[in-house]
Swiss-Prot record:
GO MF term (any one): zinc ion binding
Family (UniProt): Belongs to the universal ribosomal protein uS14 family. Zinc-binding uS14 subfamily.
UniProt-annotated binding residues for Zn(2+): C15, C18, C33, C36
Cofactor section: Zn(2+)
Quaternary structure annotation from Swiss-Prot or TrEMBL: Part of the 30S ribosomal subunit.
InterPro entries hit by this protein: Ribosomal_uS14, Ribosomal_uS14_arc, Ribosomal_uS14_CS, RIbosomal_uS14_euk_arc, Ribosomal_uS14_sf
Signal peptide residue numbers: none
Record text on cofactor binding: Binds 1 zinc ion per subunit.
This protein's UniProt keywords: Metal-binding, Ribonucleoprotein, Ribosomal protein, RNA-binding, rRNA-binding, Zinc
GO biological process, one term: cytoplasmic translation
Protein name: Small ribosomal subunit protein uS14
Function summary: Binds 16S rRNA, required for the assembly of 30S particles.
Entry keyword Cell inner membrane: no
Length: 50
């Protein structure tokens, strides 16, 4: 059985840091899940405003 890579849908993209498929932040080409984004956001220049 040959398994082809996904071309569309949730399983076609994964977090570039941990490999998770859920809750991806794709904006600006980040490709990070939300947990990794929250850890890395201050280092990559994102600021939290109230």
């Amino acid at each position: 059985m040959i398994v082809l890579p996904r071309k569309y849908g949730k399983a076609s993209r994964k977090c570039s840091r941990c490999g998770d498929h859920s809750a991806l932040v794709r904006r600006y080409g980040l490709m990070l899940c939300r947990q990794c984004f929250r850890e890395l956001a201050p280092k990559i220049g994102f600021k939290k405003y109230n």
